[in-house]
Amino acid sequence: MSLFSIIKDCGGIHNIQRVLIPDSRIIIEIHEFELLSAEAKQQAYNLTLKQVTYQQTVIENKDEFGAQLLEIGQLISDQQRQDITPYTAPVECEFRPDWHISPPQGLLNDPNGFIYHQGQYHLFYQWYPYTCVHKDKYWAHLTSKDLVNWQWQPVALTPSDWFDSYGVFSGHAISQDDLLMLFYTGNVRIGEQRDRHTTQCLATSTDGIHFTKQGPVVPELPPGVTPHCRDPKVIRHNDRWLMLLGVQREDEIGRLAIYHSEDLKTWTFIALCGDELGDFGYMWECPDFFTLNQQDFIVIGPQGIRSPDKSHTAPHHNGIVKAQLETSGKALLSDFQPLDYGFDFYAPQSLETPDGRRIMCAWMGLPDEIDHPSADNGWVHQLTTMRELSYDNGALIQKPIKELATLRHTPIVLSKDETSFDLHSKAFELQVSMQWGSVLRLHQSESGYCEIRLDSASRRLYIDRSNTLIREGDTVREMSLAESDSVQLHIFSDTSSLEVFINEGEAVMSARVFTDKNSTQLSFDGDVQIQACWLLNKASAPFIS
């Protein structure tokens, strides 16, 4: 019996939710039982999962069977694209950002495939379009000429195939001449116990818009690793390709798995790396790799480590380690430091611009925090602003990209004799110098505000959003600063977010800040000098036109 005959017996392609092929079985998940043929109804059926199982299926021609699977996956994808069309139109919401990337509807999380290819920037992100939950992820696709104004493109990848039908999970991109290659993790769940199966997959495009799935290129797990194995980052190093994967060892310790390849299609395992960091979290997610000023760095998201900030209770962290790549491809890691000391920064990705700058953006959210006020309007989360990374005198420096200056409206002149101002907007850029013991309040009205304060005794900077509309997650973040007479802050504000660059980029703190639409005032106590202020224009909306 051919696979197409099975699909026909199961009610046709429009009745198919997904196809799974564990072991020698073929499992067809359907929408309506009544559409099954009499023969299909004789097969084992799981009422809870709505799955028909064909046992002990003999596959005589594996190449033909594989081609049929990809063809059926494409048909399912075509249907999925039709189904999500109403969800590509943005819903109105008072918390919608003016110049950050947010989803039209549904849930956004990790940025993916951030790359410069054929004269423009490409940025994808994890997206579940239907509701604000983590489920069956798609890859939304945006393009830009300037890293500020983004245009919606057709969804790049949908969860349509036997190897990714429970989610086209995160990954990176490679630009090879005219070919744009997307490496990602295919996520599959089997049975009522939801056994996880993960493979590392490839999709390619010759026009940068329409992608063809090639299937798994790393079909097996690394030795000694659980199915928590994901988020491929592919780099060119020593004249060969390396793939970095975030993994969990079988003893529930997070590590980095490294593979090598000559052709980007056949991959060989090298090693698990990171033992020198010890017991450093139960899982590492979303690796990235780049070189700054001749120093190699690897970004990891270690889950379950202890934060030096006692007010940081979430298990999810992001940071950067120095990396020493050996000729074999194995990496030695050292000197972990956070990339962001705020509330909302996870799963960052970076690219190199044509003029040689390293630019990074991240998900401005965390995996366990979904109940934001915007969810009442059917969407949740946004990406951070783009930041430029450099490495000078042994210090990582992060600054807002220069292109953001194009958003500046007429400068706002604030009186030195006043301590409270109404900007009549939440979208602004602010440069201030604060003395120890001073307090700055932003997004302020009678109903609430977000506060930045410098504690003289502890020499710590605090961001406090406890007087906002936040529903879940921590409300205070803090960090120690070096001895100085004053602290320089470069603040970028949008409708429901703040990003604070500290002391010329020595540290950054990012926060989602939800306040009512009238919360457009700023005020301060103590010695605060406002050096510059601009209202920011809207960027082009990153939605379908």
UniProtKB/Swiss-Prot annotation:
PROSITE patterns: GLYCOSYL_HYDROL_F32. Gene3D superfamilies: Exo-inulinase, domain 1, Glycosyl hydrolase domain, family 43. It is found in: Cytoplasm. One of its GO terms (biological process) is sucrose metabolic process. The active site is at residue 110. Its EC number is 3.2.1.26. Keywords: Cytoplasm, Glycosidase, Hydrolase. Belongs to the glycosyl hydrolase 32 family. This is Probable sucrose-6-phosphate hydrolase. It comes from Psychromonas ingrahamii (strain DSM 17664 / CCUG 51855 / 37).
